[in-house]
């Protein structure tokens, strides 16, 4: 992909597939209204993250479930509340496939897993109570300290929460094998209760932000994720000349190429193993900055997958000369990669981040960008 183009404006063919999927007009103006129920969210999402439930939301959680009000429990309550007609539109078998492959595993930078207009989470397809549950379980997947930042990203990129996001549920939440997926522009996130084997986050995820328009300035002012790149660039500045030479690569790979490499194929970049103690400490800070937006259980799952494959020491850090906005030597495009860990950060023309973390390199990637 050239730097003159972006997957946001060259939409995947999958946007126009069967099942009523419609193409997204990325740059079309959107209504700036906010559909979220902030009063409800102050209780439901905060308590979900804190593992305790306020009496303000009894209509969502039964007394028996109050001891464990996770996003997973909310998926189950949502599923139980859906009518047969609703289930026919947003619920699928575990192994459902279409032109996008195994649908529950698909990831892209700008897509909708179900029709974003007819089945939008903020539209008339869902009842008010169902909308509240979806909002609570969605924000329950994030660190509470990040809720306002996630709202800002959704406002900047999609006109706000509930405007053009869609969901799907795979399998049966009544069993131990299910997955909830929410999608939209710069959004793919999952909730699976660790029922998807070998992977963190329930599978590959995507996040991004175009804070000040499609083409951001080199400063990326207002971008809620740019601090991650600054943290990584801080490590680059700590490297000596030889280390920088290993870390800096001329051209970035295609951003969606986030699959795991075959055994024996060397990962480009500077091995974390070769860093000094203070540099390794900073590398851990980079990792923490990457996983910080998410709930504790998902952060722990990432660390567990890393540990199963030698930890951060087995990863490599690469920065790319191509796409350096402002030619300022602050590398907009970079990647942290290990045998079963890919975190690809593309900052030009705005932020796209592809995440693929597992404990087993045999897990295939189903990405399109």
Task: Outline where the language-model segments fall.
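Compositionally biased, intrinsically disordered low-complexity regions enriched in proline and serine
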Residues: 22, 41, 80-83
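N-terminal compositionally biased, intrinsically disordered segments and leader/signal-like regions
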Residues: 17, 44-48, 106
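Residue-level detector of intrinsically disordered/flexible regions characterized by low predicted structural confidence
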Residues: 20, 44, 88-89
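N-terminal secretory signal peptides
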Residues: 1-39
């Amino acid at each position: 992909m050239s730097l003159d183009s972006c997957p946001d404006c060259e939409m995947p063919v999958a946007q126009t597939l069967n099942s009523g999927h419609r193409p997204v007009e990325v740059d079309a103006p959107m209504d700036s209204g906010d559909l979220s129920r902030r009063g409800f969210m102050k209780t439901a999402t905060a308590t979900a993250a804190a593992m305790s439930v306020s009496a303000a939301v009894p209509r969502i959680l039964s007394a028996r479930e109050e001891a464990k009000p996770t996003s997973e429990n909310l998926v189950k309550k949502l599923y139980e509340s859906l009518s047969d007609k609703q289930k026919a539109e947003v619920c699928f078998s575990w192994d459902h496939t279409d032109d996008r492959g195994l649908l529950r595993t698909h990831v892209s930078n700008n897509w909708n897993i179900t029709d974003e207009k007819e089945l939008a989470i903020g539209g008339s397809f869902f009842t008010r109570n169902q909308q509240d549950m979806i909002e609570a379980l969605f924000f329950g997947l994030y660190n509470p300290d990040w809720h306002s930042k996630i709202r800002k990203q959704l406002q900047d990129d999609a006109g706000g929460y509930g405007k053009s996001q869609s969901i799907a549920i795979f399998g049966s939440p009544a069993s131990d094998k299910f997955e909830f997926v929410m999608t939209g522009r710069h959004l793919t996130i999952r909730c699976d209760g660790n029922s998807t084997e070998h992977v963190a986050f329930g599978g590959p995820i995507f996040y991004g932000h175009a804070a000040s328009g499609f083409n951001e300035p080199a400063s990326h002012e207002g971008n809620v994720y740019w601090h991650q790149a600054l943290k990584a660039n801080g490590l680059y500045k700590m490297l000596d000349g030889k280390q920088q030479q290993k870390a800096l690569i001329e051209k970035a790979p295609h951003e969606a190429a986030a699959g795991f490499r075959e055994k024996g194929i060397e990962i480009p970049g500077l091995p974390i193993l070769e860093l000094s103690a203070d540099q390794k400490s900073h590398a851990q800070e980079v990792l923490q900055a990457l996983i910080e937006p998410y709930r504790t259980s998902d952060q722990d799952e990432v660390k567990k997958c890393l540990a199963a494959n030698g930890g951060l020491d087995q990863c490599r850090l690469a920065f790319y000369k191509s796409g350096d906005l402002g030619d300022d030597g602050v590398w907009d495009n970079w990647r942290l990669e290990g045998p079963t860990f890919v975190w690809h950060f593309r900052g030009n023309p705005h932020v796209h981040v592809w995440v693929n973390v597992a404990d087993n390199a045999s897990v295939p990637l189903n990405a399109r960008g």
